């Protein structure tokens, strides 16, 4: 988003591509996690659990579509302070979807619902979406430390077993290498330059938010329903913790360094603001 605001890769729609693909990646991760969670922690046959998980996914998708269309057209565009109202409505809807999915047994499906809701509403809004995004970003900056703080509180570095850490780091490294290579090969058919393909492949490396949300969910479910599986749930937390610690800062650093060097800058926001202020004075 910072690169987009500064005009890098805008003409090629690279920031939009990265955010859209990230949403689809999160969608796949949440769906797969919910399916595995149902199979591991809940009683019944594997087929029944898989069907129940798919049912929950369908309910989440349907709820996200309905809420998305609601937010698209309400409040109406003729109202005052429409951006502020839309921003708070989106935040309330997101929080309600996540918290409301827990009491009705749709564990983890709230995140899937918010992703679909976010996609549906964003396709309607044009000029206001960046302003609404700014409001959500400011709120996220407040709650983000709490989310990652909870993950860090559940993982005791002194109690981490060396073999678990080694296996986790090796698995993450292998997965990242395969991921980066596959993305680069796919971008070869999309018409991007060599530098742009390298940047896009590396920009998909960071993993943090989804891992921070789903990791504690597995541990919480194990503590409540199946305490004998708590050890394995802690291993999941360890992998999530290492994924955040390794990929998030390094990915952000690479994007910050390589973005201005590998992407074409099509406009300078500071110059545009200066020109607008000059026109207003005249």
Curated annotation (Swiss-Prot):
GO cellular component terms given for this protein: membrane
UniProt protein name: Putative SLC9B1-like protein SLC9B1P1
Any idea which UniProt keywords this protein has? Membrane, Transmembrane, Transmembrane helix
Q: Which residues cross the membrane?
A: 27-47, 51-71, 87-107, 135-155, 174-194, 198-218, 239-259
Question: According to its record, how does it sit in the membrane?
Answer: Multi-pass membrane protein
As for subcellular location, the record says:
Membrane
Q: Which family does it belong to?
A: Belongs to the monovalent cation:proton antiporter 1 (CPA1) transporter (TC 2.A.36) family.
Q: Which GO terms describe its molecular function?
A: antiporter activity
- Give the GO biological process terms: inorganic cation transmembrane transport; proton transmembrane transport
Where is this chain primarily localised? membrane
Task: Name the encoding gene, please.
Answer: SLC9B1P1
Species annotation: Homo sapiens
């Amino acid at each position: 988003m910072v690169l987009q605001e500064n005009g890098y890769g805008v003409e090629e729609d690279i920031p939009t591509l990265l955010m859209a693909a990230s949403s689809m990646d999160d969608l796949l991760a949440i769906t797969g996690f919910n399916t595995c969670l149902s199979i591991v922690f809940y009683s019944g046959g594997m087929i029944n659990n898989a069907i129940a998980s798919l049912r929950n996914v369908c309910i989440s998708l349907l709820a996200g579509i309905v809420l998305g269309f609601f937010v698209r057209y309400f409040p109406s565009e003729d109202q005052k302070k429409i951006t502020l109202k839309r921003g708070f409505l989106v935040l309330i809807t997101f929080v309600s979807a996540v918290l409301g999915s827990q009491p009705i047994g749709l564990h983890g499906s709230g995140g899937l619902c918010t992703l679909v809701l976010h996609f549906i509403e964003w396709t309607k809004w044009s000029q206001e979406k960046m302003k609404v995004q700014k409001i959500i970003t400011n709120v996220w900056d407040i709650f983000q430390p709490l989310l990652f703080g909870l993950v860090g509180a559940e993982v005791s570095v002194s109690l981490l077993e060396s073999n678990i850490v080694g296996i986790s780091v090796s698995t993450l490294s292998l997965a990242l290498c395969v991921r980066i290579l596959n993305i680069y090969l796919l971008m070869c058919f999309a018409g991007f330059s060599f530098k742009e393909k390298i940047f896009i492949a590396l920009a998909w490396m960071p993993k943090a938010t989804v891992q921070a949300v789903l990791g504690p969910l597995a541990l919480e479910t194990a503590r409540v329903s199946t305490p004998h599986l708590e050890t394995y749930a802690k291993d999941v937390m360890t992998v999530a913790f290492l994924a955040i610690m390794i990929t998030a800062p390094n990915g952000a650093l690479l994007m910050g360094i390589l973005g201005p060097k590998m992407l074409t800058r099509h406009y300078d926001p500071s110059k545009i603001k200066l020109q607008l202020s000059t026109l207003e004075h005249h």
